[in-house]
């Protein structure tokens, strides 16, 4: 763990000699012991990528609540840019966990230190050194390549956590880079609003000493144990909405932020939106029927053993789905062996 801590310190303070007292303070804030308990938890061993993220969410008993119908706003396939506000240190986990219910081809723009601390998410992250500044051409190309392959790219355009003020959390100004990516690749643009907050100690530390608050991320994440994150998945924003801004992407990015904050409060949309495609016929009933099943056992890897009690007096979406899957598998088998 000391090796990871030392590397994190070098990344945050390159070519700098850190005094003993300051390094001791950083080590205390980082929390090697709590970090070890998390990273070596048996429920996370041999897991990577989305599977690891979902296991961490389950381990923390973190509840990411979204309205069921809102998942229709995330396209099932095709290039997609997801934009979100950034109130807490675990927004990335919450966003990946939420989007992964629809898509698996996910990458997220994150601080370059994240995959150093958690190598399990390296396949999901595109690391940026200056999150609030301009990105390198290499990283921009990596994002474009992922979108050209039809993947999902998650971005918090503020680039850093919201500040605490007397009037509440204040989101930083959004970097318009996400608009360049969306328009260049003609992607779906999905806004997601997260309702949550870090501890007041964290915000106070960030106000007076940002470097120390950066080292508190692990401890702060664990403080969200058992909490609920309200995730509001908005309708896709039509890219045609930005034509009137005459290439003033900074102004367009500001409107996107205003739009997100408005729909989070059930206010009016500030931009044109695209109505979601409905789920396939019967899928909503199928999902509802599965959720009503009795859980017999919860496995450590997140899987569940459930029992379904069929009411023979009415049609069963689960039996219908099993029948459809059986027919599909048999037809594929006979085609291969014809």
Give the positions of each predicted feature.
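Catalytic core of membrane glycerolipid acyltransferases/transacylases, capturing the structured
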Residues: 32-37, 80-134
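A conserved beta-strand-loop-helix scaffold within acyl/acetyltransferase catalytic domains
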Residues: 299-338
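Non-catalytic C-terminal accessory region of glycerolipid acyltransferases
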Residues: 2-5, 137-285
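Pre-Walker A (Motif I) flank of P-loop NTPase domains
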Residues: 76-85, 151, 155
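Short, flexible loop segments at the rims of nucleotide/cofactor-binding pockets, characterized by
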Residues: 57-63, 85, 129-134, 167-168
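Membrane-anchoring hydrophobic helices of lipid-metabolizing enzymes
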Residues: 1-80, 90-94, 101
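Hydrophobic beta-strand scaffold residues
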Residues: 64, 106-108, 153, 189
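Conserved N-terminal entry element of GNAT/NAT acetyltransferase domains
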Residues: 274-313
